[in-house]
């Protein structure tokens, strides 16, 4: 979508005050009246000039460092004495502007960043052609598509399609939980997920297959080592390791094992996920409520290109439940395009559309 920059010649913005910065009173403690950031294009006036903070995201603060560079920082990363922007107004009157109409070009009746404002329906048609074009554009420009995946990807036949997207250069990084990797690895070693075959039939003693898969990987030392020694021979994790695509596996309170690569410290996991969210030029969130919302909170609604131009960050959220897609948007990820369908259908149909476009270009998929 086209980016419409703010009109800084407007009287309020042309003659308004600089943003005010107040030192943080202690590590991880913010000054009273701190400005709570959004994921929309945001500007702070410093030295009479409107500037955008680096590494934007919602639910954080704007910090002016010793070199007068603006950064977006999480509360827990703020140190005593850091200069933190204060102010509640988002229209520039306090030196901070949230540009809510950046991609509409039209004045909004109520331009403030808000939660709980979604419109999602399973009756909306899915434009797979557009989604395929977005993926191809990202690959062509050397972008960094971040995929956030839930366990349904492994339970369904979507597993093979995910492997195809990895092998053909459409995945920059994958963020997921322990279960995604466990089910995928179980499928590689035993041909089942949670003891079920690809046809959904239970196998004798299959209830323990995922534990045996975890044990084999722990014996190898890591997922990469299990790929190298032949324990894992196919699947999503095998494709990621083979293609040297980074992944972050985040633990939860209910995890079995977990696998040795899983990050069990929530704050360390946040930092690991954030490192990829900062680089994301597109996000595809499939069949996972918690990981989708967590990642959505880390993503800006826009991408700043190397030449300084700005475009909307395409964010696709796929789930069989309208509730999940609505909740993501209600938590502030307004730019998310909701697709209410199951993971298997979405992945397979999207792959067919991408393959068709590649064939029309005369550059068929390599695998």
Cite the ranges covered by each PLM segment.
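Glycine-rich phosphate/diphosphate-binding loops that line cofactor/substrate pockets in enzymes
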Residues: 129-145, 240, 275-280
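Gly-rich Lys/Arg/Thr-decorated short loops/hinges at beta-loop-alpha junctions or inter-strand turns
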Residues: 104-119, 141, 214-220
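Long terminal accessory regions outside catalytic cores
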Residues: 1-70, 74-79
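C-terminal functional extensions of proteins
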Residues: 197-198, 203-247, 252-283, 288-367
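Short acidic, glycine/serine/threonine-rich loops at helix termini
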Residues: 96-100, 157-161, 184-190, 259-262, ...
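Gly/Ser/Thr-rich loops at beta-strand to alpha-helix junctions
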Residues: 90-91, 149-156, 179-182, 255, ...
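Loop/turn positions that initiate beta-strands
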Residues: 79-87
């Amino acid at each position: 979508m086209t980016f419409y920059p703010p009109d800084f010649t407007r009287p309020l913005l042309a003659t308004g005050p600089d943003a005010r910065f107040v030192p943080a009173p202690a590590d991880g403690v913010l000054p009273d009246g701190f400005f709570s950031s959004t994921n929309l294009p945001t500007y702070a006036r410093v030295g009479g000039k409107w500037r955008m903070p680096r590494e934007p995201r919602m639910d954080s603060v704007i910090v002016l460092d010793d070199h007068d560079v603006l950064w977006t920082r999480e509360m827990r990363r703020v140190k005593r004495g850091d200069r933190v922007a204060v102010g509640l107004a988002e229209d520039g009157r306090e030196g901070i502007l949230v540009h809510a109409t950046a991609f509409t070009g039209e004045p909004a009746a109520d331009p403030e960043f808000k939660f709980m404002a979604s419109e999602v329906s399973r009756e909306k048609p899915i434009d797979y052609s557009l989604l395929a074009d977005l993926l191809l554009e990202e690959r062509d420009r050397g972008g960094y598509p971040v995929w956030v995946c839930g366990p349904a990807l492994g339970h369904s036949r979507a597993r093979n399609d995910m492997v195809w997207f990895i092998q053909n250069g459409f995945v920059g990084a994958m963020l997921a939980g322990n279960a995604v990797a466990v089910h995928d690895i179980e499928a590689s070693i035993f041909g089942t997920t949670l003891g079920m075959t690809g046809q959904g039939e239970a196998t004798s003693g299959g209830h323990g297959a995922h534990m045996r898969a975890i044990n084999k990987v722990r014996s190898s030392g890591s997922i990469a080592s299990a790929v190298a020694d032949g324990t894992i021979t196919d699947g999503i994790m095998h494709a990621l390791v083979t293609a040297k695509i980074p992944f972050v596996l985040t633990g939860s309170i209910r995890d079995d094992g977990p696998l040795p690569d899983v990050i069990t410290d929530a704050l360390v996991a946040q930092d690991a996920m954030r490192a990829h969210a900062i680089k994301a030029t597109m996000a595809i969130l499939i069949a996972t409520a918690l990981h989708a919302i967590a990642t959505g909170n880390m993503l800006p609604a826009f991408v700043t290109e190397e030449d300084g131009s700005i475009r909307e960050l395409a964010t696709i959220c796929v789930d069989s439940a309208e509730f999940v897609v609505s909740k993501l948007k209600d938590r502030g990820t307004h730019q998310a395009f909701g697709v209410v369908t199951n993971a298997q259908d979405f992945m397979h149909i999207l792959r067919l559309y991408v393959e068709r476009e590649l064939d029309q270009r005369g550059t068929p998929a390599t695998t």
